[in-house]
């Protein structure tokens, strides 16, 4: 049933865009693109269609918010996942200096906030790993570090 309703909404919105408006054109005074509206409404199916038609998922509205901010404000983990999988920039701040992660926490969506925190950590680790690969000392940096715990005397890897 959800797919049916998404398809109907998608068809309606698709016909609006087929009238000649750009997929990234802000349709309202708030400068929200169709991707902003889809993410803010938690409509992952329409957001996916926006992706397939070339929407700029990093476009900011008058508040400086991207579709990622909108999805975080409504707690749409589906939209957040789709946006992150599309390599959206997660560190963008709105005009109040808030990231999507900050908004998820402040709007009471801890699951979404933890998801964005995890993605941010993974991206940081990935970029750190890429820097190490370019570093001539990389083999030394990749060696495991261990320490002996006082209680057990067992060697453990230290993260």
Swiss-Prot record:
Localization per record: Nucleus; Cytoplasm
SUPFAM superfamilies: Ankyrin repeat (SSF48403)
Major localisation: nucleus
One Pfam family this sequence matches: Ank_2
Tissue: Expressed testis, ovary, uterus, kidney, liver, but not in other tissues.
InterPro entries assigned to the protein according to its UniProt record, in alphabetical order: Ank_Repeat/CDKN_Inhibitor (IPR050776), Ankyrin_rpt (IPR002110), Ankyrin_rpt-contain_sf (IPR036770)
Claim: Ligase is one of the keywords in the record: no
UniProt KW keywords: ANK repeat, Cytoplasm, Nucleus, Repeat, Ubl conjugation
Cellular component terms (Gene Ontology): cytoplasm; cytosol; male germ cell nucleus; mitochondrion; nucleoplasm
Motif Nuclear localization signal, chain ranges: 130-150
Keyword Glycosyltransferase appears in the UniProt entry: no
ANK repeats by residue range: 1-25, 30-59, 63-92
Post-translational modification: Ubiquitinated by the CRL2(FEM1B) complex, leading to its degradation.
PANTHER family recorded: ANK_REP_REGION DOMAIN-CONTAINING PROTEIN, ANKYRIN REPEAT DOMAIN-CONTAINING PROTEIN 37
Record-given protein name: Ankyrin repeat domain-containing protein 37
Gene name of this polypeptide: Ankrd37
């Amino acid at each position: 049933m959800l797919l049916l309703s998404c398809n109907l909404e998608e068809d309606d919105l698709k016909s609006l865009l087929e009238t000649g408006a750009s997929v990234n054109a802000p349709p309202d005074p708030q400068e929200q693109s169709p991707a902003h509206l889809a993410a803010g409404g938690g409509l992952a199916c329409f957001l996916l269609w926006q992706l397939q038609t070339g929407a700029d998922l990093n476009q900011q509205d008058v508040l400086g918010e991207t579709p990622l901010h909108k999805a975080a404000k409504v707690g749409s983990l589906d939209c957040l996942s789709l946006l992150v999988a599309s390599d959206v920039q997660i560190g963008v701040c709105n005009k109040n200096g808030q990231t999507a992660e900050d908004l998820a926490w402040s709007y009471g969506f801890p699951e979404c906030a933890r998801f964005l925190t995890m993605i941010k950590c993974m991206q940081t680790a990935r970029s750190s790993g890429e820097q190490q690969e370019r570093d001539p000392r990389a083999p030394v940096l990749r060696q495991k570090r261990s320490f002996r715990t006082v209680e057990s005397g067992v060697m453990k890897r230290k993260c």
